[in-house]
Amino acid sequence: MKRQKRDKLTRAHSKGYQAGISGRSKDICPFQQNDARSEWLGGWREAVEDRHVGLSVK
């Protein structure tokens, strides 16, 4: 059975969240395309909010 590839925008959001929750800067966004960059930054913002609320991954 073939493993289905995840949507690139979903992956960008997930990677942004991972970067944000680990405390990295939003300036390290690896995406150049506006859609993917927007999703990455959205994930990053969500993670930063979660960190401020007290949720963290160690």
Curated annotation (Swiss-Prot):
Record's subcellular location: Cytoplasm
GO cellular component, one term: cytoplasm
Superkingdom of the source species: Bacteria
Pfam families: RMF
GO biological processes: regulation of translation
Basic residues compositional bias, start-end: 1-14
Entry keywords, A to Z: Cytoplasm, Translation regulation
Cited InterPro entries: Ribosome_modulation_factor, RMF_sf
Region entry Disordered, spans: 1-25
Family: Belongs to the ribosome modulation factor family.
Protein's job: During stationary phase, converts 70S ribosomes to an inactive dimeric form (100S ribosomes).
NCBIfam families per record: PRK14563.1 (NF011162), Rmf_CrpP_fam (NF041886)
Stated name of the protein: Ribosome modulation factor
